[in-house]
Amino acid sequence: MLFRSNIKGENSVATQAIRLWLERVRKITKKSIKHWCITERGGNATERIHIHGILWGIGLESLIRETWKYGFIFIGQYVTEKTINYITKYMYKKDEKHPTFTGKVLCSAGIGSQYTTRVDAKNNKYKGENTKETYRCGNGAKIN
């Protein structure tokens, strides 16, 4: 999602836009959309704030296009490790052109909370130098 150039500000503008958008969605659907989004300061000539995100739900495209009022939208129809990596990289992106800008995560409460009850969480519990940090890929392979 991309903001029109006439909207000023940085993360506070994006935070308000997401909040107002979710309120419009809730008014229409009577329920909330589970989401995980992060802001990015654009490069090149525009330097606009972008929001990259993942939205949970089926058939949301027309609803998003109808209710998002803040600029351009690109909607993909899939989520893979590649798309998740693309979106989450903005949490740690070093922007040399805007060194004071830090992306802000905007997400539904409780995303990831079920992880704490999984065996993986116990395996990855902090144990000083003995901490195991294993990631399991979609194909079952483990990365340490």
Residue ranges: model-predicted function:
Residues 1-47, 57-144:
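Right-hand nucleic-acid polymerase module
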Residues 50:
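Conserved, short, structured surface segments that act as functional micro-motifs
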